[in-house]
Amino acid sequence: MYKRQPLGRWIDYVFYVSFFPQLVAGPIVRARDFIPQMYKNPTVTRSEFGEGLFLILCGLFKKTVISDYISMNFVDRIFDAPLLYTGVENLLGVYGYALQIYCDFSGYSDMAIGIALLLGFRFNINFPSPYQSATITEFWRRWHISLSSWLKDYLYIS
């Protein structure tokens, strides 16, 4: 359904729900944002190609270098045996986990957005620096924007 009307062909629906860049880890792409792009001739400019490649590489770096490294070499060790570490080290483990989870989620989103851009589809940025927020409310608005929007629309969270 798009604009309260069924899509013209079932293959359009299948394409929308199975579009692989966003299928596994998001971002959650709404039909109102995706369907109009489906019917346009997908063109990728040199600038968009560069932007897409940059997003893929940044996302890959966040996920594999930062998130996975912090997880394996720092956070998991502290969380597996917290009594072996001091209070400060445990606190650093919590901060490390916050960085790890951000880099994991935003890394996947950046890669998906970059791949979609290489295919001629533009998705919105999903994690615009949430840890630079001044309030919890602002943090929630910046953290996984597509999920927050979906929850707001379908679970009526305001």
Where are these regions (language model features)?
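Membrane-embedded transmembrane alpha-helical bundles that form the catalytic cores
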Residues: 3-158
